[in-house]
Amino acid sequence: MPKIMLRSWSNTLVSVRQVTQRNAGHRTPGVDGQVALTSTARAEMAVQVHRTISTWDPIPVRRVYVPKANGKRRPLGIPAQMDRCHQARVRHALEPEWEARFEPKSYGFRPGRGCADAIASLFTTLKGRSKRVWIVDADLSAAFDRVDHGRLLAALGSFPARDMIACWLKAGVIENGSFTPTEEGTPQGGVISPLMMNVALHGLEEAAGVRYQTSGSGAGDTRPDSPVVIRYADDLVACAHSREQAEQTKARPAEWLAPRGLVFNDDKTKIVHLTEGFDFLGVNVRRSRNGKLLITPSPAAVKRLRKRLADEMRALRGSNAAAVIAALTPIIRGWAAYYRGVVSSKTFGELDDYAWKLTWRWAKRSHSGKPKGWVTDRYFGRFNKFRNDHWVFGNRAGRDERGNVPYLIKFAWTPIVRHQMVTGTASPDDPDLADYWAARRRRVKPPLDSYNLRLLTKQAGRCPLCRDPLLTADQPPQSPQEWERWWLSVVRRAIAVDYLVHQDGRGKPDGNQTRLIHASCRRELQARTRRMPARPPATSPRLA
């Protein structure tokens, strides 16, 4: 099967489409500066990718740095777009095989799994009277930069594209015009790098002493006396029954990781009791005095958000209300969407109070000579007709033809929805589980408004023109920042509302209908028909 996938023209087309249109970084070039942004360029790239299946020579990656939450910078390696297309093609051939092997409690960078599943797994493991009260909160030190190439390639066995993967690993890095060879690690930023990290870490659970029941009604569940390891990429948590078991659960993986070039980060790895609490994937997990397990947004995450909101408002001094709404709306939507699956109601309310204070200060500063009543009448009111809230920040000057005032949404308007955790080792690649994944997609609803959510459900989540998923093809966003980018790139720019006029049997208009399609598909449709697009309806895709 891998050989068939590697030679498949359909795989090439899907890979090129994913890299050049669907991925968030499709406009980001590598060292060659080349990106395919038009239909003609994408078609030429697909032909070139398919012609060079066995002859492609990988290009060094371009080094860039992105800021981390702790103030440091994370190095990323951006491959050329041709390399990314080849990597996507190889990943599609390799991933199904490894998805059938991976541990059930590994959630990072896997199709159909994500942060919400890892957090839900923690809740299931620790809730109630669970005796696993000692926690190993572990973090691998620079895992992507240190993984041993030899061990990784040995794990791939006889995979047909193994040599090409080796070339990607050894391609090197170009930074400020100078070339540096890569003797270890897999660069963050590559399409295939997350899969390589999961392959390298496969077996960590067994090394930690995790054992599963193999028979009876509990087959597939963790043994009652066994620790539980929940991993998201290079970030993991081990839940043990005693301090001694926790020490062993930390020591055994450390020995297993050493030959693979990986070590625990001593500054971030610690053993704590569940009542002390710990942070994992942006949430704080602890058991309260009454024995109830609480999972809330971590204080560090809340502090970072408050600082960012304050910085944004400071930068907006002298701007108008429309700029304030445009700048803050994606931040609020993204943060609320990520934390809507945990105990966030109190935090959302506190953040709404903080955001209101920031907007009030901005309004007072913008009109320092005006009384409070004038400022209130100009910028605050009941602009959301579905909410009985008269202190919503809005832009009265931007009132549309229907009298609607653009306004700033609030955190608390995002409903708390418990996440439905993925079951065991279920994989989207398993044809026997097609009904399970279809039902799961219906239950796990994206944070859209009710109108567009109905359209999305009616279309089974797919674009009627290309039949690809409309929102997230591989997995949902995995952080508040990714949710923010998802809102900006997917909902605002990548999805369009198509306006249809149906006719009855006599050729007369028979009502108006709308459908959601990819913006790129709409542009291609307009290019083919050479017609001007009809006026879109008033309702557009937006988050709830």
What residue ranges belong to the model's regions?
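Histidine-centered nuclease catalytic patch
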Residues: 470-516
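Reverse-transcriptase-like RNA-dependent polymerase core
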Residues: 18, 48-72, 81, 85-96, ...
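Short, charged surface segments at domain edges that flank catalytic/cofactor-binding sites
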Residues: 428-484, 508
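Non-catalytic, polymerase-adjacent accessory regions of viral genome-replication enzymes
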Residues: 1-45
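Short Cys/His-centered divalent metal-binding micro-motifs
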Residues: 468-471, 508-537
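Conserved polymerase palm-domain catalytic core
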Residues: 101-113, 117-277, 474
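Extended C-terminal regions of large enzymes
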Residues: 354-454, 543
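A conserved non-catalytic segment of reverse transcriptases
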Residues: 170, 260-335
